[in-house]
C-alpha cells in the first residue's frame, strides 16, 4: 500500500470502529446512566491503536478486516475500562483524560467503577456472539482465552498491581519492563495476536508478529513516559508531569530522558525487523509503528 492508501485505510478502519462501538452501546438494555457512563469514556476519542493493530494484522494476512471488527471493539472496551479504573482516586487520581473530565468526575466513583465493569464484561459477550463462519468456534474460544489472560492477573492487571506497588520505590530496568510488558504490552500484543488468529497466520508468522507487538508495546510506553515530560497538556489530554507527581517509576527517571529516547529507538527498530521477517503485507502495521515512535499525544 502507498502511504496515502495506508492513511486512508487506517482512517476508514478507525471510523468503522467508532461506528460499531456506538452501535454496541446503543443496543444495550440497562440503566440509562450506566449506558451514558460507558459511552462517555468509550466515545471520548483516542487513537484506537489496539483495534487498528488487530484490523491491520488481518489485512496484512490478506483477509477482510471487517471480520475482526467485533474483537477489535472488544479490545477497545477493555482498554477503556482500564482507563476509567486507572483514573480513580484510589489509583492515579486523575481529573483529565483525553482532554475531558475523567469518568468519576462526571458520574461519581461508584458509577465509574460500574461503567468499567460493564465494558470489561461486555467485551467478552461480543466475542461469544460472533456468528461468522470465517471465525469458527475453536478460534473464538482461543480469542476469549487469550484475551482473559492478556487483560487479567497474568497480564494488564498484573502490570497495574506492580505499578502501584512500585510507587515511591527505585526499580531496576527489569522491574520497570515487567510493569510495562504487562500493563501496556500484553493488550497491544493480544491485538496483533488476535489479528493473526483471525487472519490465519502460520506458526512462523505468528511468532514474528508476536515479537513485533512485544517491542511495539514497550516502545509505546516509553514514548508515553517521554510525553509526560515533554508533551503539551492540550495534546496529550491529561496533566503533564502526573507520573512524577505520583512518584511513578518511568524510563526517563531510570535511564534519563536521553537514555529513554535511545531505548525507544531500539524497540522501534526491533519491531520493524520482526515485522519484515513475518513476510506479510505489513504497510499499515509499519505505519502504526512510525506513529508510535513520533506521536505527540
UniProtKB/Swiss-Prot annotation:
Pfam families: polyprenyl_synt
Residues given in the record as Mg(2+) 1 binding sites: 86, 92
Residue positions binding isopentenyl diphosphate: 47, 50, 79, 98
Bound cofactor: record note: Binds 2 Mg(2+) ions per subunit.
Record GO biological process: isoprenoid biosynthetic process
Disulfide bond positions: none
Keywords: Cytoplasm, Isoprene biosynthesis, Magnesium, Metal-binding, Transferase
Subcellular location(s) of the protein: Cytoplasm
Reactions mediated catalytically: isopentenyl diphosphate + (2E)-geranyl diphosphate = (2E,6E)-farnesyl diphosphate + diphosphate
Superkingdom of the organism of origin: Bacteria
Keyword Cytoplasm recorded: yes
Cellular component terms per the entry's GO annotation: cytoplasm
Binding site for (2E)-geranyl diphosphate: 97, 183-184, 221, 238
CDD domains reported for this sequence: Trans_IPPS_HT (cd00685)
EC number per UniProt: 2.5.1.10
Cofactor: Mg(2+)
Binding site for Mg(2+) 2: 86, 92
Family listed: Belongs to the FPP/GGPP synthase family.
Name of the protein described by the UniProt record: Farnesyl diphosphate synthase
Organism of derivation: Geobacillus stearothermophilus (Bacillus stearothermophilus)
Lineage: Bacteria, Bacillati, Bacillota, Bacilli, Bacillales
Amino acid at each position: 500500500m502507498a502511504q496515502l492508501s495506508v492513511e486512508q485505510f487506517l482512517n476508514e478502519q478507525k471510523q468503522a470502529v467508532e461506528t460499531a462501538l456506538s452501535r454496541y452501546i446503543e443496543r444495550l438494555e440497562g440503566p440509562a446512566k450506566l449506558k451514558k457512563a460507558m459511552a462517555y469514556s468509550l466515545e471520548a476519542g483516542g487513537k484506537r491503536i489496539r483495534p487498528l493493530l488487530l484490523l491491520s494484522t488481518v489485512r496484512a494476512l490478506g483477509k477482510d478486516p471487517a471480520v475482526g471488527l467485533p474483537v477489535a471493539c472488544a479490545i477497545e472496551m477493555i482498554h477503556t475500562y482500564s482507563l476509567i479504573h486507572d483514573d480513580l482516586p484510589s489509583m492515579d487520581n486523575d481529573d483529565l483524560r483525553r482532554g475531558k473530565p475523567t469518568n468519576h468526575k462526571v458520574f461519581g466513583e461508584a458509577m465509574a467503577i460500574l461503567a468499567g465493569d460493564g465494558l470489561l464484561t461486555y467485551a467478552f459477550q461480543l466475542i461469544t456472539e460472533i456468528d461468522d463462519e470465517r471465525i469458527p468456534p475453536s478460534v473464538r474460544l482461543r480469542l476469549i482465552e487469550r484475551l482473559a489472560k492478556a487483560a487479567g492477573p497474568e497480564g494488564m492487571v498484573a502490570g497495574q498491581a506492580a505499578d502501584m506497588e512500585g510507587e515511591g520505590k527505585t526499580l531496576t530496568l527489569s522491574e520497570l519492563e515487567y510493569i510495562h510488558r504487562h500493563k501496556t504490552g500484553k493488550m497491544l500484543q493480544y491485538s496483533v495476536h488476535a489479528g493473526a488468529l483471525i487472519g490465519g497466520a502460520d506458526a512462523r508468522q505468528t511468532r514474528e508478529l508476536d515479537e513485533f507487538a512485544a517491542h511495539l508495546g514497550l516502545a509505546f510506553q516509553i514514548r508515553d513516559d517521554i510525553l509526560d515530560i515533554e508533551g503539551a497538556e492540550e495534546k496529550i489530554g491529561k496533566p503533564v508531569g502526573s507520573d512524577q507527581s505520583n512518584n511513578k517509576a518511568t524510563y526517563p527517571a531510570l535511564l534519563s530522558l536521553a537514555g529513554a529516547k535511545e531505548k525507544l529507538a531500539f524497540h522501534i527498530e526491533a519491531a520493524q525487523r520482526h515485522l519484515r521477517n513475518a513476510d506479510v503485507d505489513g504497510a499499515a502495521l509499519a505505519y502504526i509503528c512510525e506513529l508510535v515512535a513520533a506521536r505527540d499525544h
